[in-house]
A protein has these predicted regions:
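Structured, active/binding-site neighborhoods that engage oxygen-rich ligands
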Residues: 1-193
Length: 193
């Protein structure tokens, strides 16, 4: 089962379908849309927690998802990068003091939230536009597709995605996926559920 972690594969074979206490970065990688829908930061964090707990109910898995959704919510609401950084450091205890240039030489492949989320946030904080954030996240190496997914969600909320990149991405997606993306964009209004 390519693309799935060993813990998930073992979980599939179990008779119980309870969450498996994962601290992996999958919870943070998939949570970006949660940062787009809710009116309050509190509600955003609550739904991010629920999203994580389905599979990643370890405190680090939950924290990673909440941190990512919080950054996206704050970026959408017009908070500055400095305000976002301060909030993340205070609320989640992530050390965001190292620059990407300091992270890069000692960074390695790490599938944990604590080894991915702060680095993705740092790439977002250092980037100057959407594309720069993406390039910076990729340049860190490690689990760079996940890093880039997380940082990209933050960059989209803060900068938007340039039209030329949207158009290029559409060339590689199916018509069905175009329809999903259009519905998402139209539904990107704040909701309460």
């Amino acid at each position: 089962m390519q693309g799935y972690g060993g813990t998930f594969i073992r979980w599939l074979a179990m008779k119980s379908y309870e969450p498996y206490n994962s601290w992996g970065n999958g919870s943070a990688m998939r949570v970006s849309s949660v940062g787009c829908f809710f009116q309050t930061l509190e509600r955003t964090r609550e739904v991010a927690r629920w999203s994580a707990e389905v599979t990643h109910n370890h405190p680090e898995g939950v924290k990673g998802a909440e941190a990512v959704a919080s950054v996206i919510w704050m970026a959408r609401k017009g908070f500055s990068k400095e305000e976002i950084k301060t909030y993340v450091e205070k609320e989640f205890g992530y050390d965001l003091s190292k620059s990407c240039d300091e992270i890069r030489p000692e960074y390695y492949f790490d599938v944990s939230c604590q080894g991915t989320v702060p680095q993705a946030i740092t790439a977002f904080l250092e980037g100057t536009d959407f594309e720069d954030v993406i390039r910076t996240a990729v340049s860190l190496g490690g689990d760079c597709d996940t890093l880039t997914c997380i940082a990209g969600g933050m960059a989209e909320a803060f900068y938007g995605v340039p039209d030329f990149l949207k158009e290029k991405c559409l060339e590689f997606t199916t018509r069905e996926m175009h329809e999903v993306m259009e519905r998402f964009e139209k539904g990107k209004l704040e909701i309460e559920r």
